[in-house]
């Protein structure tokens, strides 16, 4: 009985729902008859009634299809896959490590250009950087990596720099091997209107070092994203960043700025057409112009005249130098020249380029230097940058300068960074870590063959919270035969060995006569080692295996110092381990008449060189001197038997970007020639001084700029020459010098 009631109740409910459904449909049809309205086909987008009040920025069909005149993501992916068939390449699958495990090590070979080959200015600079690097080889059998002689920088078919038939030509290379162990440099790919990443030839298994690289097509751990740079970008050296001249206050006159082209149609126009929305003419200046290209007047809109007029009111360089943040939107391609300009100016880049694989993203932590925005959230950018604190602003700006100086200021640095990244992948067991790449002085100046431990370098003591060791090794450069126990070198040995910080003494014997027996040397409380210098002046800076301490005291055989002077200089060096600390100063200057650099030993109010005849420095600079500097500079030093100390100062100043440190008041640090017999000391020869003038100009030419920095301060001991008891002074002997 109860079951029957349940079924009856269920049936009644079902009937009610059916009647309600039909009643609702009847009401809708009656309303249509009364209002004379017909049923409409459902639309995916609303049909606004107030169309006159809403300007059409895009057609409704474009919105339904995803917007933009370019191909769909699927079409772009298919086009990429058809050209780059090895899209899954990784170092383990598409690179022959066996070519790099030979005795030659990591060597790079450049294919010789064919007769009459057209090479653009930018690609010529790249080839020059490779050929002048320490990795270049002219023998392809020694090569680990290959670089094409064919210009592949500009693959826009409408460009005058476009080189046709690349695919056929590279397949004719006997060493091409489907691109394995090759690196291809490219700045521009694709052409109007879609600017796809089509290079016009199959790169195969080659590593692609490309600007404006899309994350969809980037092969992680294999390809390398490089910055877009102009043909005017300097070959080497390059200008320093501008933060040193404009560091305080952290916030500048303008909060955010952009000044550039506005694309009226085509890819990249969506973002740049919307930039005027954030312009307020006060602390945010966003200026665009339609006046570019041949047909801009055909496509100009109602806003062009006003934008062009506003565009002329502001100077780009003034905005760049006086803005805290710089907007870096995408152009036709993902990369932009604005990126490097912002880095140099210490104007924090605010990126609006969705899908852009940032330059050298494998090793650079870009969140420490840029603000990444979203093209779809342009209106949120002002509030985002306003929320960045002052301490964060200063940190970001400082990091822009670190990255600019280390990797982007010249074509040389861009190319060498590319090669060093590949080298780290090949020799991963001795590769650099992220701190080495992102902290001063940068990865190019940290050679992992020296050590993989941060504590072994002079740059990371503050990062690690430690101090250098309490011992040093003295290296004495000897060029005169030992004929008397009263020679200056005998006195010097006694003075140095009395220092409680001296671990050992190494005599680098560069005399024509063979070194004397051990019994001829005076007894000392520290180990004494005599090493053959092979009669090469540059050998005093070779990385001798016997040097185990971090600090090296470099001395000439005729140097005159007190033990207390050595101890004080060593204490000062422990506070400046990345610089040269010592006694004899020299200086450089620019001669406007000769239009060349000059060198002077006069006592002036400033100095830029500390001679290594009496100076402390870190032993890592021996490794840099031998493995970073080109052999041509070391050969120049050996040929002239001169300038090795100037070259070491150039090297250390280029690494530290700081001047050396002069200690105490001593000016004369050598025995006078009359006390050494009839033979005149080399430094007393006028020809010796002339050679040093020439060396300064030769070295600055190789570095591409003048790395030496002037300083006007000297460090003396506390209580130096104060009217207090000598018993309270630790270095009282320094006052009698």
From Swiss-Prot:
Q: Report which reactions are catalysed by this protein.
A: 3-O-{[(1->4)-beta-D-GlcA-(1->4)-alpha-D-GlcNAc](n)-(1->4)-beta-D-GlcA-(1->3)-beta-D-Gal-(1->3)-beta-D-Gal-(1->4)-beta-D-Xyl}-L-seryl-[protein] + UDP-N-acetyl-alpha-D-glucosamine = 3-O-{alpha-D-GlcNAc-[(1->4)-beta-D-GlcA-(1->4)-alpha-D-GlcNAc](n)-(1->4)-beta-D-GlcA-(1->3)-beta-D-Gal-(1->3)-beta-D-Gal-(1->4)-beta-D-Xyl}-L-seryl-[protein] + UDP + H(+); 3-O-{alpha-D-GlcNAc-[(1->4)-beta-D-GlcA-(1->4)-alpha-D-GlcNAc](n)-(1->4)-beta-D-GlcA-(1->3)-beta-D-Gal-(1->3)-beta-D-Gal-(1->4)-beta-D-Xyl}-L-seryl-[protein] + UDP-alpha-D-glucuronate = 3-O-{[(1->4)-beta-D-GlcA-(1->4)-alpha-D-GlcNAc](n+1)-(1->4)-beta-D-GlcA-(1->3)-beta-D-Gal-(1->3)-beta-D-Gal-(1->4)-beta-D-Xyl}-L-seryl-[protein] + UDP + H(+)
Pathway named in the protein's UniProt entry: Protein modification; protein glycosylation
Domain of life, per UniProt, equals: Eukaryota
Give the transmembrane ranges: 7-27
| Residue ranges, Cytoplasmic side | 1-6
The cofactor(s) it depends on are:
Mn(2+)
Q: Which residues are glycosylated?
A: 194, 322
Report the membrane topology from the UniProt record: Single-pass type II membrane protein
Protein transport as a keyword?
Answer: no
Which GO molecular function entries does the Swiss-Prot or TrEMBL record give? acetylglucosaminyltransferase activity; glucuronosyl-N-acetylglucosaminyl-proteoglycan 4-alpha-N-acetylglucosaminyltransferase activity; glucuronosyltransferase activity; metal ion binding; N-acetylglucosaminyl-proteoglycan 4-beta-glucuronosyltransferase activity
Q: Where is the active site?
A: 645
Q: Where in the cell is it found?
A: Endoplasmic reticulum membrane
Q: Name one GO cellular component term.
A: endoplasmic reticulum membrane
InterPro entries membership: Exostosin, Exostosin_GT47, GT64_dom, Nucleotide-diphossugar_trans
State the signal peptide span. none
Stated role: Glycosyltransferase required for the biosynthesis of heparan-sulfate.
- Indicate what this protein is called per its UniProt record: Exostosin-1c
Question: Which species?
Answer: Danio rerio
- In the UniProt record, the gene name given for this protein reads ext1c
């Amino acid at each position: 009985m109860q079951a029957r009631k349940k079924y009856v109740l269920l049936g009644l409910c079902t009937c009610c729902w059916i009647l309600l459904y039909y009643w609702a449909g009847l009401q809708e049809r009656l309303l249509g008859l009364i209002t004379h309205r017909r049923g409409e086909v459902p639309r995916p987008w609303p049909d606004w009634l107030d169309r006159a009040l809403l300007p059409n920025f895009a057609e409704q069909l474009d919105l339904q299809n995803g917007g933009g005149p370019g191909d769909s993501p699927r079409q772009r992916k298919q086009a990429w896959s058809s050209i780059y068939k090895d899209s899954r390449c990784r170092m383990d699958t598409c690179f022959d490590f066996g070519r790099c495990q030979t005795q030659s090590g990591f060597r790079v070979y450049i294919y010789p250009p064919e007769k009459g080959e057209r090479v653009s200015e930018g690609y010529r600079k790249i080839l020059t950087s490779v050929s002048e690097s320490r990795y270049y080889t002219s023998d392809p059998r020694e090569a680990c990596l290959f670089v094409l002689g064919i210009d592949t920088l500009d693959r826009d078919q409408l460009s005058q720099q476009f080189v046709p038939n690349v695919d056929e030509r590279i397949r004719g290379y006997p060493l091409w091997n489907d691109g394995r162990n090759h690196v291809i440099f490219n700045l521009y790919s694709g052409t109007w209107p879609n600017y796809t990443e089509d290079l016009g030839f199959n790169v195969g298994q080659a590593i692609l070092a490309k600007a404006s690289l899309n994350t969809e097509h980037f092969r992680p751990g294999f390809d390398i994203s490089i910055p877009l740079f102009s043909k005017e970008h300097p070959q080497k050296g390059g200008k320093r960043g501008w933060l040193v001249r404009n560091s305080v206050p952290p916030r500048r006159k303008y909060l955010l700025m952009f000044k550039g082209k506005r694309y009226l149609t085509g890819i990249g126009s969506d973002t740049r057409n919307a930039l005027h929305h954030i312009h307020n003419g006060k602390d945010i200046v966003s200026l665009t112009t339609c006046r570019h290209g041949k047909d801009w007047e055909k496509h100009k809109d109602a806003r062009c005249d006003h934008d062009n007029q506003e565009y002329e009111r502001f100077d780009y360089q003034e905005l760049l130098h006086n803005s805290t943040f710089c907007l870096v939107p995408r152009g036709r391609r993902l990369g932009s020249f604005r990126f490097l300009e912002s880095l140099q100016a210490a104007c924090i880049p605010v990126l609006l380029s969705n899908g852009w694989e940032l330059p050298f993203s494998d090793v650079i932590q870009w969140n420490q230097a840029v603000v990444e925005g979203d093209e779809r959230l342009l209106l949120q950018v002002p509030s985002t940058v306003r929320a960045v604190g002052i301490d964060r602003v200063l940190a970001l700006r400082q990091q822009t300068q670190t990255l600019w100086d280390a990797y982007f200021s010249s074509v040389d640095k861009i190319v060498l960074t590319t090669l060093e990244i590949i080298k780290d992948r090949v020799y991963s067991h001795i590769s650099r870590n992220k701190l080495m790449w992102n902290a001063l002085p940068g990865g190019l100046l940290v050679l992992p063959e020296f050590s993989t431990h941060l504590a072994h370098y002079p740059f990371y003591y503050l990062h690690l919270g430690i101090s250098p060791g309490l011992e040093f090794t003295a290296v004495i450069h000897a060029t005169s035969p030992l004929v008397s126990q009263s020679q200056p070198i005998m006195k010097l040995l006694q003075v140095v060995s009395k220092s409680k910080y001296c671990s050992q003494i190494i005599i680098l014997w560069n005399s024509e006569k063979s070194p004397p027996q051990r019994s001829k040397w005076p007894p000392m409380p520290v180990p004494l080692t005599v090493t053959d210098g092979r009669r090469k002046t540059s050998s005093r800076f070779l990385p001798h295996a016997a040097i185990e301490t971090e600090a090296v005291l470099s001395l000439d055989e005729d140097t005159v110092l007190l033990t207390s002077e050595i101890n004080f200089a060593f204490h000062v060096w422990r506070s400046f381990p990345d610089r040269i600390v010592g006694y004899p100063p020299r200086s450089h200057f620019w001669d406007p008449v000769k239009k060349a650099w000059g060198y002077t030993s006069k006592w002036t109010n400033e100095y830029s060189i500390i001679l290594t005849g009496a100076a402390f420095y870190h032993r890592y600079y021996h490794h840099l001197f031998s493995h970073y500097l080109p052999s041509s500079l070391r050969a120049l030093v050996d040929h002239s038997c001169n300038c090795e100390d100037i070259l070491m100062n150039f090297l250390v100043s280029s690494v530290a970007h700081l001047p050396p440190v002069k200690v105490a008041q001593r000016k004369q640090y050598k025995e006078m020639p009359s006390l050494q017999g009839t033979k005149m000391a080399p430094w007393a020869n006028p020809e010796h001084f002339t050679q040093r003038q020439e060396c300064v100009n030769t070295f600055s030419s190789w570095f591409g700029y003048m790395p030496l920095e002037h300083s006007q301060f000297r460090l003396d001991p506390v209580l130096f020459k104060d009217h207090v008891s000598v018993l309270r002074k630790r270095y009282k002997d320094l006052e009698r010098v």
